[in-house]
Amino acid sequence: MDKSSKPTIRLLFATKGCAISHSLLLLTGQISTEPLYVVSYTWTPDLDDVFVKNGREEITQVIPTKRPREVTENDEENQIMHLFCSRDVNVIFYLIGGFSTGDVRSRVWPIFFCCFKTQTDFKALYKALWYGAPLNPHIISDTLCISETFDIHSEVIQTLMVTTHHLNRKGLSDNGLCITEATLCKLVKKSVGRQELTSLYAHYERQVLAAYRRLYWGYGCSPFWYIVRFGPSEKTLVLATRYYLLQTDTSYNTLETPLYDLQAIKDLFLTYQVPALPNCSGYNISDLLSFDKLSMFCCSSTYTRGLTAKNALSYILQRIHTDTTEIHAVSEYITNDRKGLKVPDREFVDYIYLAHFECFNRKQIADHLQAVTYSDFVNKPVLLKSSNLGKRATANFFNHVRSRLNMRDYIKKNVICDVTELGPEIGHKYTITKTYTLSLTYAAKPSKFIGVCDLATTLTRRVENIEKQFSPYGWSSTIPSNPPGFDELSNFEDSVVSAEALRAANFANDTPNQSGRTGFDTSPGITKLLLFFSAATGIATHDVSILSYKTPLEALIGHSEVTGPMPVYRVALPQGAQAFAVIANDTWSSITNRYTLPHEARLIAEDLKQINPCNFVAASLRDMQLTLLLSTSVKNVSKISSNIPKDQLYINRNELFNTNLIITNLILDVDFHIRKPIPLGILHAGMRAFRHGILTAMQLLFPKAVVNPNKDPCYFYKTACPEPTVEVLDDDNLLDITSHSDIDFYIENGELYTCVEENYTEDVWFFDTQTTSEVHTHADVSNNENLHETLPCNCKEKIGFRVCVPIPNPYALVGSSTLKGFAQILQQAVLLEREFVEYIGPYLRDFSFIDTGVYSHGHSLRLPFFSKVTTTGTAVGQLLPFYVVPEQCIDILAFVTSHRNPANFHFHSRPQSNVPVQFILHNLGGEYAEFFERKVARNKQIFSPPQISLTKALKERGVTCLDAFTLEAFVDSTILESIVEHIAVHFPGRDREYTLTSSKCIAIKRDWVLFQLICGTKGFTCLRYPHRGGRTAPRTFVSLRVDHHNRLCISLAQQCFATKCDSNRMHTIFTLEVPNYPNLTSS
């Protein structure tokens, strides 16, 4: 019978001296004086009758002693010896070590292969395995299988023969350094054994010892090493040692069970809670200072043999399978959701962390560990489906996430619409008073210009004079005196700061700074003044002898018999200057008539009507054809900006968003950040799906309106590409600090403005019209069915769109937050459109493409047909129509013409139908947006320690009153000195700028307070980069807040105007902890 098929015991041993030296003596035919001690062992299943049925569980009498028990010829021993002697048993002896090459990382390596046959040998083996008795080296020598043993060592011996030059010199090459291939082949075929090893050991003892010590690198491990690595309990010492060293396959090529590290194995055995008898050796873990005691302790343990030992292996394999199954369930959900859950990158990162947290938070882990704990002594462990970890996570989290993958379920489960119904009469009056006059945005025929357009400073003086004239007749102050931007960020319901404290903060900000202006003037900026004027009903005086105009709005416009509301525009002038306009009547035809299809193009457009609108590809190519026809017909478009506001008004115009009015047109600012250029056919196909997603969402959100996604219009405008080297002035990055700083001051002085439209200078589209016109003007659409073969769009990094969707009658929206939420819902609706993801998805860098920052009071958005202004005064990046014709469009030319109607691309246009507004959508509730952030916040509230309030943290430091004066005094006296010290250490030479600094309170909220630092010298310099040239000094702020660890912290941040510093983006420089004593420590 083949020896490899015999019953086998794998045995890990140790010696008191050097195990390598003693082993080499045995391998070379000598007898060592040092006995061998069994540390751990395992057996093949055909020896279960020996080790399981006669294990420690069958022993009923336990006699604790600190010496080995006398082994007598009792029934137990006779029974075991009978079972042993009925067969030959292979015993393979191991030492810690082995090769580490490729994917194989051995933990133990065999050194002896023995075959036990006689009763004397079995008796010695029985004493060693059952009671830890020393194993005499004579037994190893007598039972050693020479052939099998030296098969283990053949490679080592051959290598040693080569390295020690133990070869015939004729086999060497001429230089005596390299061995020929023929010699190596001869050497490999040569059988090596004890004779060769003995010769090597006799002549090269040092080299042989070194080689074997490198192979069996654990030869010097002490008993303490085993205790530290596998202890400290008896269960882990015995079971973990056996599993980790003898029962784990460490070859990654053949690995089926995941390879866990030692600590993980020890942790897994903690839930294997089978009752065990006391160790009959009488030793404790602390007594195991020698290998004889370690061997007695391990071999006498209940965990060494019997059902406890046999079931341990089955349990650990099932436990690993159960754990990995639950983990893989989460991975599978994430992998599947990765394909279908199209969300912005930040939300997807939150989703990944939340998915794991929902499965592996403390409660879930505790329940899982309880479910997989095994304490049955008799039955084989069965852990399959014992844990519901993945199921609970699915019910609590993944099902909710999956609801975001279906538009109907997404809106039904995540969106709550707060709608107020108006009566017919009230609705009619509400529509008239809260929308622009119809003629203001009507472009059917030429009309003269009636309005005012001038620089901000001029308009400010004009408004002040008008207020002085009308104030005796009841004209009230235009805007409440909150700090600029405070009304947009403060949550009054959550705020714990009193109104008196806010007024004190406002009063504290009236102190002039070095520029002559107050740090944060409480008077409203020009944008809010104009928005208030244009929307307010105001008063009217009929005493013409006293005043020339009846209302302040008439006085502002300089024309009688005009009524509001009126649109307010921002106009970007060359060199960064700004102008504003309030218009009662305009010559829109002079703007839009430039963008009409020529007569020849009209005939071609008529031919395009024959295309089947249900053919998605053909319809997309038809839309591309119409867009190209328009692009080739545009003429006489000025590319030179003007310094005269009224002239520049027809080159650059941005509508200011007015929260005092209702929204009748949904204007979306869309920016696709792309990986590579998109073919125009693909782009048109993707935008058809974009349109369908928006209108489908509106159909669900407005149940009492008639919305037909296949028929209702949706107007697209695409930004033309400027020259690659052009730098755009009105770079519309939204500032982080707009709501905490005096932005209006910078607007009026032309130093800063945030329009929040396109975020980069590399605007979009506009390919070479000379090339495309020749190729596509008379193209046969039916012959070009491959959208990927169309010409690519020339934009390299970003594609910008303005998408205008009329709110269906009889609905209207109110409020900035409502519109922001609505835009977020529509973005999710677009991402749920399969065609959009299929066509556009592969080209997108991320899935956050609708900018909601434009929907803030006083922010502006560039209108279609207008351009941006560059630093050189050039007008670039026009917003031109990008046609997406509805499937059921009856008159294509009428649809094309409607793109030029200003009533379709203003936020607050009056509905063109006679149906008054009856339903006002004023709030969107539910978890339609920021679901992951809200989930994180709830989990943090449940599992994190209670968060102390800012008020409590300040009271611990002696600040009992939360008013601006007290907070400023606290910062000036306690914090600024330490900030200066920190700057002196980390920013040498800059501390002089902060020596005469004082703080000004800007905003007080429930959980943070913001201050601006006022420099008493020439001003601050940027702490991030050493900018060249005379640049406006950056603004420096400090914020006071409590972090997640309940530490009161102060953060210093700067807002630098340099492009290298992201053009006014707020950047935190450092954060310090505020302890209960004056000196701060770095956080």
Curated annotation (Swiss-Prot):
Broad enzyme group:
transferase
Q: What is this protein called?
A: DNA primase
Q: Please give one Pfam family short name.
A: Herpes_UL52
- Cited InterPro entries: HSV_PRIM
Coarse class of the protein's main subcellular location: host cell
Biological process (GO) annotations held by this record are: bidirectional double-stranded viral DNA replication; DNA replication
Q: Which residues form the signal peptide?
A: none
Organism annotation:
Varicella-zoster virus (strain Oka vaccine)
The answer on whether this UniProt entry bears the keyword Zinc-finger reads yes
